[in-house]
Structure formats: C-alpha cells, structure tokens
Amino acid sequence: MKHLDLTRGTTVITGGANGMGAEIARQLAARGTALALIDHDTAALDRITEELRGARVSTHVVDLRDDDAVFAAVSDITETHQRINALITCAGSSMLGDIDQLTMEEMRWLTDVNLWGTVSVTKALLPALRAAPAAHITHLASVYALAAPAGRIPYAVSKFAVRAFSEALRHELDGTSVSVGAVYPAGVRTGIILHGRYAAAIDPKVAARAAAAQAAMYHTEPADAAARIIRATERRAARTMVGREARLIDVLTRVAPSSYWRVMRRPLREAIDTTTPIS
C-alpha cells in the first residue's frame, strides 16, 4: 500500500489540545500539514493555537459524548478544509477503581468518552475521508486493549472495544481508498494517569498514590511516541506498538493468554492498590 503524504491534506486530531494529541499536532505543523484540532478544553485549544501560530490550524470545541456536536463540528471542518486525508483519535481519559468501588454511571462515562466518542467522530468524518484519493484513520487504543489489569475495568473495556471497532472498520473498508489502523501505546509520559479520574468511593490520597505509582513506570517520551504514531499513519499501518512495554506485553499475551496477569501483577501492585489506607 502506498504511503500517505500528510502534507497533501488535512489531518483531524481529537484530543488535539493536550497530551499526545498536542504533541502530534506540533510535529505535523512543523512539517506543514494542515490541522483540524478537536478538544473539549477551550483554554488548551487557545494555547495550542498560539503555540502553532503561522501554521494552518482550525480548532473546534467539542464534547465527544454529544453526537450532534460532533457532526456539527465535522461539518465545519469539511467546509474549512478542502481535502481531509487523515484522522487520529487521541481523545480519552482514564478511570481508577475496583468493580465494587465504581458506579455504573462512572463506568458509562468513560466508555462514552473513550469508545463512543471515537466511533462518533469516525462515522461523521468518513464521507470526507472517502472523498480523498487516499486516507487513513489511526485509532489510539492502549496496551490495555491487549491486557486487562485489575483496577482498570472501564478503561480496559473501552480500549478493547476501540480495538474491536478499529479492526472491524478496517475489514469493512478493505479495498477502498480509506485504510484503518490502531496503535497501542504503553508507558508514555503524557499525564493521563495523573490527571485521570478515579471512583468517588476511593480516598483521594489513596488514588493519588496509585496514580503516582503507575506514572513512575512510564518511560516513553511523548515526542518519541508521537513520531511513531505519525509514521504509522503515513505507512497506513494496521497495528503498531508504541513503547517497549507495549511490545513486551504484546508478546506476553500471545505466549500466555490465560496467565499473563501472574507476570504483570507484581510490578503493578502499588498502581492498582485502591484500598490500603495511607498511614
């Protein structure tokens, strides 16, 4: 499959004002790629717009849980940008808590953001992507779409579902001008864990301790991860591991699909402890 030239069209990035999405936007803007950035954070969009002054960037404030708002934003994007040849879905959040600590409302909230927000923007943008001579969709899944740890049920559920959506859509679009792939990051220092949510039933200090323990395990720099995600998009890759931990866990889950947790549990012990009080 011929590589995609991202400078010959517009790349739409969800979660484009923060974390991984913002880093991808910086690197693409430096290459001269036109961008449409979607985020719910108005202030962060203002900051990234100022940072990328001189680049071809449009920004769109959208809550991805609102389907009508998503489709309206995509309509604005297609009116502003003549050719859209890439979508990179980075928007998402995390949720810490055991099944007994989490409410149904908390779990549904994360699924709405991580899964249905991804589905909604992909569906809305698909006609514009089909109109391009060649286009690619990159969905950010997670290493937790390969291995499901304790204490991260809603996050793992949402990311496994993103993986399934991405694979099924890739098969539906096989033979068309639009290719689809998923990337599986692990250990990227974006702050998603430190700024993520936790069950209301958890002591905030305990949640902060668990989040800090998880963040301490992260070693991949956002700039390196962003460069790999951009390469995967250009190459129209179907499946890309991002970070050393992702590659290791990918192998582990293949070799020991029913017992990988025995290996993962020890290093994650403090990161999933949401019950031990702080003395």
Model-based region annotation:
Residues 42-43, 61-72, 104:
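The beta1-alpha1 cofactor-binding region of Rossmann-like NAD(H)/NADP(H)-dependent oxidoreductases
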Residues 33-47:
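Conserved glycine-rich Rossmann-like NAD(P)H-binding loop of the short-chain dehydrogenase/reductase
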